[in-house]
Swiss-Prot record:
It comes from the Bacteria. An accessory protein needed during the final step in the assembly of 30S ribosomal subunit, possibly for assembly of the head region. Essential for efficient processing of 16S rRNA. May be needed both before and after RbfA during the maturation of 16S rRNA. It has affinity for free ribosomal 30S subunits but not for 70S ribosomes. It comes from Pseudomonas entomophila (strain L48). GO terms for molecular function: ribosome binding. The keyword Chaperone applies. It is found in: Cytoplasm. One of its GO terms (biological process) is ribosomal small subunit biogenesis. This is Ribosome maturation factor RimM. It holds the Pfam family RimM. One of its GO terms (cellular component) is ribosome. Binds ribosomal protein uS19.
């Protein structure tokens, strides 16, 4: 395993190691990619835990009932593998595939101000939830917000009118009383 990290501000979290598998140093991974196997397309990962980072190299991986089972180069022992439990798996943002003009990665939406059709500022996007039917924006109040309510807005074409990453704003069709 290599100790040379990527630039911290360039990293995007794409998964997390949550346990060990077997006795030969394999780890169980929860992937944030869709489909989950896409995580295996990145041969080098930066692991991050409690402010420390290190680079690792993927040897192999396969799907399992609760995620992925992964073998990392130089990790051959269950006890050593256990030390990686809880580590975030990161890659450089530059490795992510380009999206269509009207598509966004979740990390791009976090922090955007959310303003409705009546020019009411609801707050900023804190994070997103995956519900199965559609993704949900979790909007928390910020300075200048209409009120102090947390709002859950569907991330759908009916609700989201426009996204302006440069201005840091998402415009939505959503009643302030909802």
């Amino acid at each position: 395993m290599n100790a040379t990290p990527e630039k911290a501000d360039d990293l995007i979290v794409v998964g997390k190691i949550f346990s060990v598998h077997g006795v030969r140093g394999e780890v169980k991974v929860y992937s944030f990619t869709d489909p989950i196997e896409n995580l295996l397309d990145y041969p080098r990962w930066t692991l991050r835990h409690e402010g420390k980072v290190k680079q690792v190299e993927l040897v192999s991986g396969r799907g399992s009932q609760k995620g992925l089972v992964v073998k990392l180069k130089g990790l051959d022992d269950r006890d050593e593998a256990r030390l990686l439990s809880g580590h975030e798996i990161c890659i450089s943002r530059s490795l992510l595939p380009n999206l269509a003009t009207d598509e966004y990665y979740w990390y791009q939406l976090v922090g955007l101000k959310v303003i409705n059709q009546d020019e009411h500022l609801f707050g900023k996007i804190d994070h997103l939830l995956e519900t199965g039917a559609n993704d949900v924006l979790v909007v928390k109040p910020c300075a200048g917000s209409l009120d102090d309510r947390e709002r859950l807005l569907p991330y759908t074409g009916q609700c989201v009118l426009a996204v302006d990453l440069e201005a840091g704003v998402m415009r939505v069709e959503w009643d302030a009383d909802f």
